[in-house]
């Protein structure tokens, strides 16, 4: 009985196996034999007549255990009483059948065989150990070449390969015993077992000190690393060659009889059978002393069979089964989505679950869901059985079963009792963030569909068009508790991604609330006064006052002191009704709803109520406004017909005007005044402006207020109400219905020049319809592809961040990052208050210009403090950030700040990494699904000027202006900025001026809002003459570096610089334009005294002729920028992935590494050499090679600052980290990622991105190993590095020097310290091979590892319980230790001592550990 109890997984009394870590290492032959219960000698599986397993076969009962519980094979011993007896007839132990899942067997191999993982998994471990190439190894292993193992006194060298003939010749020459050479895995095994690891490591270290060059040290380091890992892990190299092959238990490779006498079997049995057959044949051949060549062939076949068993298809052809299907080997069992890790360990199927279609349940409360009776009966069966038994209605489970099956009335009563206050979990796939699973209290309903509360739809992303949801029942009391306290829908009002309420009315509800809070002039009852809400309701019911009439009413309010007061408001009956639902609170006054409520406003109202009135009040409020919204929308009866789509009368005049404009552009193009590209850009611009104008007219007409004959205001247009309230439809969609559809994009993103002038109400012409199919089709294709991409991005993010958990309250770091308002193209896109909200201040925040403290250091910035910061016009704030957190594992609560979904400081144990990954990944899918709604409509129109967004005084920084012949100011510098300063001297906006921009304002001038500040050409980059003179062409040779483009349409030609490097003659050309002094014929010089020359880049269009006189400020040439591509998240998702994968962009920008002056050096082949001479003499000058023909925005003698771009393009994030540091990198990543999401109107809090970037910065690269064991170029964790360096410094040795490196999320996940987590992510075999050689230990710190080994995760309640357990265990340990010490001292007193105890004896009682061995 005892055994059964201890191995039964559902037995609560069985002691749980406790362990703190899991180690993986190589198995020695002895170890394999110790696992084995017997040798498998025959390839037979089972006897096909009796269906009994064959003796000594792959399913042998003697080795693996009985087939039926407590019954031997021949049937001599049956039942429990013979437990443990071994039958003398069939040799089977009488025990549980379950042991067939755990007992292993083995095969004694007749010849050693190399393990394919250590041979072929790159870099080949066997190859590294022996310092041989993989090709040579394979030649030896597959019996092509001999290898010299012991050269003796001959001229041969160790490890030399020889062919058969050479071997025989050498034997003739030196004699057979003069040297040893061998072939096959035996040879490799001999060589491996001869290796003295410590000696090798010493030699390699010596070599490393002397090695020079690039490759040699690298190679030595690689070998040294693997030798060290063998030394540390206690593995022996020869264990990579197998002499004994383990056989996994038969139940894990089952053989199942199908009907009709056929069998289904696991592929492994086939693979094992091949191995056994070949092995037995080889044994026989060796006994028979067969010719060498035959034995050798058999050995090679054995090697191939074992290879196929371990990893089919890794080498040679794939071994296929009967139906030409590749057999699944042991490696394939682990790999991929269907492998052991992802299919069975991380994703299990769950008992007590059901699924059904969902329908809306508007009469439910927020914490309820409707559960069909039939489903509930099935799900809660065990509970019902136990309750039936407790009530004495049934005495056995069988009886209870019958009762339930008959659905007797008492069963329904009991079901009611069972379900009361027993929450269930509802889940909708795909579960993209944690709000995809929430708990509800079930309400029993008739019918077969689950009823879902309408307000939680947005969290689940559910709608009622046939979606299905799954129900799960939390069984244990703890699970029910967690479901209620943590997962109840009422506890998840705020979104973890941005902290805004996610329980927000949508669609009908919004429309109803909008209609309720409308105010219209001239309605019945206007100007009446009411004393109370009840009176208003009375008047409404009597029809004396209209819902939208303006009235005066007295309303109860709470003042600042908390007293109840009555205030008078001018309002409408509708708003009064809504105000009556607001909880009474000074912070939620009636003014909150005394206005026209759109969707955003409703969200703000809910947010305010949640922040100030608490959770309970706000949940009740949400339920009430939901009911009101539905009711009022239903009463209003808003709907629309085709006549509600208004087409503005001014549409055709506008269109015709633009048509004339476009004709004019065509004419200019024919006359050659503009290029094809410029014409295209201008036409696209004109049409896009036209489309906007028509849309504007339509919106103006549709939203215009109209009056009836009596002078009362009419109801607004229904379509306008729907769109304006935020219920459904966008201005872009309305534009397509009633304005003009506008420009369309081709599938590659280019915009088609001819727009669609019709709208859907007028109907499209055939050509227009054809043009619009591109966009529609691209939308659908995009969706399908990007759902997968987005899911994969989320998977990688979760994997990299899964072990980032809040572990401590405060790490006490001094580091912080600076937060300031996010500005995009001069416009504030997210104010400072928004960015610091929910963060901890790292320094006191002061009112500018005084020392009044707004927020003290270490305080959490809540809404109130954020508003104070905003009002005080603080420019930037130092805040704590997960990036700079110095917690050993995970992050600390102070650096993370507020838990966005709770609104308080984050709790210890919160899995912030996963929350961050889900918050970034979840919108990815949403965005992908949003591309086609607008159907590929192009957003044309490039901005070409900038207007002041604020009033203030203009201030130029680093001005560098030139006035051209027309008196316009042209920007000539790279670093010029224009700032707008307000009266208080605070900077309100700064704009970077691009080279060639025209400035319309003067320094110190005061500007109003919308004053045009400067303009630029969005399509080309001009190159401008600094001084007047004569242009002279250098190396601009027609046909080599210049091509003349003649436009077929116009007959005009223009000169374009072509790629001169691709022509045979053009290798050394340096095309440029020099400005000459017409008097002296010398080149003109600039202030720095350098000759003025303009190097040309490829595709530049020349605007002057050779020898033409130019004036200062004239355009010499124009470089075209890329045409207007449509911005679509298509660019977005890959962009986000590219940022997190830290890929180097193709033509990445070159960033200056220190401040200094630019010098152009001697050119090298087709690259130009730029050096920066630093201002600081202690630094060396840095050289950059830039491909010729790339536009370089700096000139000889320019001063550049550290971090300036010397070559345009996207910067590589690694460069930013190296040159400007972690904070600059974080800012870059945050801005770039947020930019993508902002375009789609998705809000994500910065801290999520910071958490992911923190996980990407976990590793350090060793630059100099000092006197530590770390090797140069190795990547180590910060914790490891500190530990090693501390140890070195304690011993007075030189510490290693390292710098942080940025890893992409895939790389970072694969390099995590936990091999279980890495193996379950990607490249399983590679990760496991590496881990086993190093003898890695998995400390089980992350979530994934713990899920895989079947424990509670160390986050949330799991973390708390494990902490409590640890405390208890330590306490017990202390007691046990003191008891033991007491007992020992008592024993010592009792024992007589003769003479002095020798304390210096060998046995000092210390266990030899790694630590005291080093001393």
UniProtKB/Swiss-Prot annotation:
Domain of life: Bacteria
GO BP annotations listed: DNA-templated transcription
Binding, Zn(2+) 2: 811, 885, 892, 895
GO cellular component, one term: DNA-directed RNA polymerase complex
Listed EC numbers: 2.7.7.6
GO molecular-function terms, A-Z: DNA binding; DNA-directed RNA polymerase activity; magnesium ion binding; zinc ion binding
Catalysed conversion reaction: RNA(n) + a ribonucleoside 5'-triphosphate = RNA(n+1) + diphosphate
InterPro entries from the UniProt entry: DNA-dir_RpoC_beta_prime (IPR045867), DNA-dir_RpoC_beta_prime_bact (IPR012754), RNA_pol_asu (IPR000722), RNA_pol_N (IPR006592), RNA_pol_Rpb1_1 (IPR007080), RNA_pol_Rpb1_3 (IPR007066), RNA_pol_Rpb1_3_sf (IPR042102), RNA_pol_Rpb1_4 (IPR007083)
Record note on cofactor: Binds 1 Mg(2+) ion per subunit. Binds 2 Zn(2+) ions per subunit.
Pfam family, one: RNA_pol_Rpb1_4
Record keywords: DNA-directed RNA polymerase, Magnesium, Metal-binding, Nucleotidyltransferase, Transcription, Transferase, Zinc
Binding site for Mg(2+): 463, 465, 467
Binding site for Zn(2+) 1: 72, 74, 87, 90
Spans traversing the lipid bilayer: none
Protein's job: DNA-dependent RNA polymerase catalyzes the transcription of DNA into RNA using the four ribonucleoside triphosphates as substrates.
Protein family membership: Belongs to the RNA polymerase beta' chain family.
Name assigned to this protein: DNA-directed RNA polymerase subunit beta'
Taxonomic placement: Bacteria, Pseudomonadati, Pseudomonadota, Alphaproteobacteria, Rhodobacterales
């Amino acid at each position: 009985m005892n055994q059964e109890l201890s191995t039964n997984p559902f037995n609560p009394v069985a002691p749980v196996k406790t362990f703190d870590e899991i180690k993986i290492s190589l198995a020695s032959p002895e170890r394999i034999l110790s696992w084995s219960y017997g040798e498998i000698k025959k390839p037979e599986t089972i006897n096909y007549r009796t269906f009994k397993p064959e003796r000594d076969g792959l399913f042998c009962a003697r080795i693996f255990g009985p087939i039926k519980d407590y019954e031997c094979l021949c049937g001599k011993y049956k039942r429990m009483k013979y437990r443990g007896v071994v039958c003398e007839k069939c040799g089977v132990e009488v025990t549980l059948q379950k042991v067939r899942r755990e007992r292993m067997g083995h095969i004694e191999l007749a010849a050693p065989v190399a393990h394919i993982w250590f041979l072929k998994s790159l870099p080949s471990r066997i190859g590294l150990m022996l310092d041989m190439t993989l090709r040579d190894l394979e030649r030896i292993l597959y019996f092509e070449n001999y290898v010299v193992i012991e050269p003796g006194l001959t001229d041969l060298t160790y490890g030399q390969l020889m062919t058969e003939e050479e071997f025989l010749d050498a034997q003739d020459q030196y004699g057979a015993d003069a040297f040893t050479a061998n072939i096959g895995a035996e040879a490799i095994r001999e060589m491996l077992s001869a290796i003295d690891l410590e000696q090798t490591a010493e030699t390699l270290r010596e070599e490393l000190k002397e090695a020079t060059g690039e490759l040699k040290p690298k190679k030595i380091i690689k070998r040294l690393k693997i030798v060290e890992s063998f030394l540390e892990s206690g593995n022996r190299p020869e264990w990579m060659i197998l002499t004994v092959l383990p056989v996994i238990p038969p139940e894990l490779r089952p053989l199942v009889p199908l009907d009709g006498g056929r069998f289904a079997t696991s592929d492994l049995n086939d693979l094992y059978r091949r191995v056994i057959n070949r092995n037995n044949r080889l044994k026989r051949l060796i006994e028979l002393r067969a010719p060498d060549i035959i034995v050798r062939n058999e050995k090679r076949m054995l090697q191939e069979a074992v290879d196929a068993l371990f990893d089919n298809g890794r080498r040679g052809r794939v071994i296929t089964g009967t139906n030409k299907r590749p057999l699944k080997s042991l490696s394939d069992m682990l790999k991929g989505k269907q492998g052991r890790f992802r299919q069975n360990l991380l994703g299990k199927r769950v008992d007590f679950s059901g699924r059904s279609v969902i329908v809306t349940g508007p009469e439910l409360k927020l914490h309820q869901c409707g559960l069909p009776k039939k489903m509930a009966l099935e799900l809660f069966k065990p509970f019902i059985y136990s309750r039936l038994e407790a009530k004495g209605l049934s005495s056995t489970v069988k009886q209870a079963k019958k009762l339930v099956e008959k659905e007797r009335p008492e069963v329904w009563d009991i079901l009611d009792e069972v379900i009361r206050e027993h929450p269930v979990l509802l889940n909708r796939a795909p579960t993209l963030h944690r709000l995809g699973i929430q708990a509800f209290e079930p309400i029993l309903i008739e019918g077969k569909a689950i009823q879902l509360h309408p307000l939680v739809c947005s969290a689940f992303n559910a709608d009622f068009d046939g979606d299905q949801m799954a129900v799960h029942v939390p069984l244990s009391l703890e699970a029910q508790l967690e479901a209620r306290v943590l997962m109840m829908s009422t506890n998840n009002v705020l979104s973890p991604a941005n902290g805004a309420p996610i329980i927000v009315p949508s669609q009908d509800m919004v429309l109803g609330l909008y209609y309720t809070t409308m105010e219209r002039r001239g309605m019945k009852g206007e100007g009446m006064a009411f004393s109370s809400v009840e009176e208003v309701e009375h008047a409404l019911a009597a029809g004396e006052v209209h819902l939208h009439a303006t009235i005066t009413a007295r309303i109860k309010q709470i003042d600042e002191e908390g007293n109840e007061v009555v205030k008078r408001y001018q309002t409408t009956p509708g708003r009064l009704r809504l105000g009556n639902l607001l909880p009474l609170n000074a912070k939620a006054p009636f003014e909150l709803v005394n206005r026209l409520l759109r969707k955003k406003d409703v969200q703000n109202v809910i947010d305010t109520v949640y922040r100030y009135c608490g959770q309970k009040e706000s949940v009740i409020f949400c339920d009430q406004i939901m009911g009101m919204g539905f009711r009022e929308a239903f009463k209003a009866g808003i709907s629309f017909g085709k006549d509600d789509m208004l087409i503005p009368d001014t549409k055709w005049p506008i269109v015709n005007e633009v048509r004339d404009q476009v004709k004019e552009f065509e004419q200019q193009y024919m006359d050659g005044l503009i290029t094809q590209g410029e014409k295209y850009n201008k036409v696209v611009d004109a049409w896009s402006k036209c489309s906007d104008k028509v849309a504007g007219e339509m919106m103006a007409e549709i939203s215009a207020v109209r009056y009836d004959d009596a002078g009362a205001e009419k109801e607004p247009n229904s379509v306008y109400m729907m769109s304006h309230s935020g219920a459904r439809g966008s201005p872009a969609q309305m534009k397509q219905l009633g304005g003009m559809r506008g420009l369309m994009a081709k599938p590659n993103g280019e915009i088609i020049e001819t727009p669609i002038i019709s709208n859907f109400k007028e109907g499209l012409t055939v050509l227009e319809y054809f043009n619009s199919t591109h966009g529609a089709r691209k939308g659908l294709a995009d969706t399908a592809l990007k759902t997968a991409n987005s899911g994969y991005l989320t998977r990688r993010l979760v994997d990299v961040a899964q072990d980032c958990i809040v572990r401590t309250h405060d790490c006490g770091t001094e580091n912080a990052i600076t937060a300031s308002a996010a500005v995009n193209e001069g416009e504030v896109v997210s104010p400072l208050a928004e960015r610091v909200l929910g963060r901890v201040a790292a320094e006191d925040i002061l009112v500018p210009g005084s020392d009044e403290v707004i927020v003290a250091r270490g305080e959490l910035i809540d809404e109130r403090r954020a508003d104070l910061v905003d009002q005080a016009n603080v420019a930037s704030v130092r805040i704590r950030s997960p990036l700079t957190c110095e917690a050993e594992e995970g992050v600390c609560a102070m650096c993370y700040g507020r838990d966005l979904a709770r609104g308080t400081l984050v709790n210890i144990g919160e899995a912030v990494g996963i929350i961050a990954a889900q918050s970034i990944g979840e919108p990815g899918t949403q965005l992908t699904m949003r591309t086609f709604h607008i159907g590929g409509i192009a957003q044309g129109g490039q901005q070409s000027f900038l207007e002041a967004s604020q009033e203030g005084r203009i201030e130029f920084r680093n001005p560098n202006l030139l006035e051209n012949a027309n008196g316009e100011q042209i920007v000539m510098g790279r670093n010029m900025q224009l700032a707008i300063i307000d009266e208080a001297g605070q900077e309100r906006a700064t704009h970077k001026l691009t080279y060639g921009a025209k400035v319309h304002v003067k320094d110190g001038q005061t500007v109003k809002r919308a004053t045009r500040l400067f303009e630029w050409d969005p399509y080309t980059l001009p190159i401008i003459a600094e001084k007047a003179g004569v242009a002279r062409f250098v190396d601009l040779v027609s046909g080599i570096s210049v091509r003349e483009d003649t436009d077929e349409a116009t007959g005009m030609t223009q000169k374009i610089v072509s790629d001169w490097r691709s022509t045979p003659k053009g290798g050394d050309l340096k095309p440029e334009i020099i400005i000459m002094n017409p008097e002296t014929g010398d080149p003109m010089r600039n202030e720095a005294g350098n000759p003025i020359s303009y190097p040309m880049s490829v595709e530049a269009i020349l605007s002057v002729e050779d020898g033409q006189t130019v004036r200062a400020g004239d355009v010499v040439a124009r470089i075209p920028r890329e045409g207007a591509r449509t911005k679509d998240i298509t660019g977005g998702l890959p962009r986000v992935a590219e940022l997190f994968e830290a890929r180097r962009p193709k033509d990445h920008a070159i960033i200056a590494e220190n401040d200094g002056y630019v010098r152009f050096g001697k050119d090298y082949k087709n690259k130009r050499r730029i050096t920066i001479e630093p201002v600081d003499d202690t630094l060396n000058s840095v050289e950059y090679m830039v491909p010729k023909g790339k536009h370089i925005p700096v000139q000889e003698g320019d001063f550049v600052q550290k971090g300036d771009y010397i070559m345009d393009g996207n910067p590589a994030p690694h460069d930013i980290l190296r040159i400007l540091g972690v904070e600059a990198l974080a800012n870059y990543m945050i801005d770039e990622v947020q930019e993508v999401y902002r375009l789609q109107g998705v809000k994500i809090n910065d801290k999520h991105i910071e958490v992911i970037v923190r996980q990407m910065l976990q590793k350090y690269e060793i630059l100099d190993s000092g006197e530590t064991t770390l090797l140069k170029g190795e990547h180590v964790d910060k914790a490891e590095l500190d530990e090693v360096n501390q140890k070195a410094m304690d011993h007075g040795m030189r510490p290693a020097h390292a710098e942080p490196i940025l890893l992409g999320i895939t790389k970072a996940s694969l390099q995590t310290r936990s091999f279980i987590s890495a193996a379950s992510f990607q490249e399983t075999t590679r990760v496991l091979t590496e881990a086993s050689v190093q003898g890695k230990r998995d400390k089980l710190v992350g979530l994934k590892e713990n899920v895989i080994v079947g424990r509670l995760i160390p986050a949330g309640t799991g973390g708390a319980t494990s902490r409590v357990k640890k405390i208890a265990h330590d306490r017990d340990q202390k007691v046990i230790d003191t008891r033991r010490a007491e007992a020992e001292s008592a024993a010592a007193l009792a024992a007589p001592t003769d003479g002095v105890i020798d304390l210096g004896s060998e046995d000092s009682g210390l266990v030899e550990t790694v630590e005291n061995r080093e001393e």
